[in-house]
Amino acid sequence: MGVLSNLEPASVFYYFEEICSIPHTSHHEKALSDYCVQFAKAHGLACRQDEMGNVLIKAPATPGYEKEPGLILQGHLDMVGDKTADCPLDLEKDAIHPVVDGGYVCAEGTTLGGDDGIAVAYALAVLDAKDIPHPALEVVLTVCEEVGLLGASAMDFSDLEGRLLLNIDSEEEGVLTAGCAGGRRVECHLPITRAAVTGTAVKADIAGLVGGHSGTEIHKGRANAIALLGRWLTLLTENGVDYAALALSGGAKENVIPKESSITLVLPAGITEAVRAAGADFTAQMKAEFGTADPGIRLQLTEEGCGEYDALDANSAERLRKALLLMPWGVQAMSMDVPGLVETSLNLGVAEMDEQEAILRFSIRSSVPSAKELLSCKLQTLTELLGGSVRFHGDYPAWTYARESALRDRCVAVYEAQYGAKPQIVAIHAGLECGILSGKIEGLDCISFGPNLLHVHTPNERADIASVARVWEYLKAILAYKV
């Protein structure tokens, strides 16, 4: 018996637990993709799998629905793999361990993968059922969504017949998403020169931050652990502390607000009173600025030994400090048309350093193409002023809100019949594959919805069990709707 075997709807949670048992972080979805292909073959369904691992499964209409317009069910196979500092799992190789915690499903020390495993579970449960009426279905399951919507960008959709698409990649029940931001990934490369230096290696860890999804939670005022390193280095400089930078790390994914970062410095005399004073100033300032959104923020200093180290020379260390201090992050502009909607933002998601260079990795989002280009230009200009270079990749278009949508009207009508209330219709500041599919499939009508998922992209992620059940009933009602 599985951990989730007593939950309803049983078929949905059965497949969700199956998905959890198969590692499927971005770029490592092959096993889950193969599982879906074997599922299709076992059920006698037409299926194709491309070289990337994207999967298309086709199911014929049930009796009485042969003349209804076909529907596309769409979600992504990959998940963001994040974990607590003490979690021993390798999420590229190890299974997720789901647990039931009251009215929620969560995971032990890791992200749950409800984004977007719940969509895959819904789709497989529909295809497996014998008692769910529906028109002809095309199930599209993509890879590498979380790292720039790469699977959808590469997938061939020329054989899709449906023009009505249900994207199940939203995280709030009662909300129908009808538009989203476009995005781009940016890598800023700063060359470094190293030189021998003698002193005490001191590691500074910034931790205790909440983190979160860089699209749907970027407006919540949470601190960025990587950007705070620039503040820390600047306070050291202002307190007259000489240092040489030795190592840098922070964050896990470009689209996750980093909750931890560290920098190792070589200090002439270790943790002196001046260093402690800078640490006290840093903690006080950060708590004053971010205490409401990030009450657990903390700085920990640890001496790691004395000796001679191959650290950054003074010029490289200063350019790194300036980059960490000056690179923009967070909300850049709010929409003038939609109250409360973020228009443009960027997330400094990953920092790393090797022997030759420091690399800062960003995720840019905007519903205005020119604003995305301007922010890209700013990052490029600042990086070049600091002697570095940039690489752009993972570009994807915005999904523009349609004034008229027959599918949206259907979903609203079904929602009102089931819930006795009107759904909220929104555009969001996050990337959805609807933008890519709309650009590739002429005349495509899209809507996105899903159950309540909390704290996605973090080890605190949890899925609301009752909401999963209600949205399952909602999905079945949409499938059974006759035009």
Where are these predicted regions, by residue range?
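Active-site metal-coordination/substrate-binding segment of hydrolases
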Residues: 65-147, 152-163, 198-201, 314-317, ...
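Active-site-adjacent substrate-binding region
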Residues: 222-248, 401-444
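His/Asp/Glu-rich mid-to-C-terminal helical/loop segments that flank catalytic regions of hydrolases
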Residues: 158, 222-239, 267-272, 318-325, ...
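Fold-level recognition of mixed alpha/beta catalytic cores in primary-metabolism enzymes, strongest
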Residues: 135-225, 233, 237
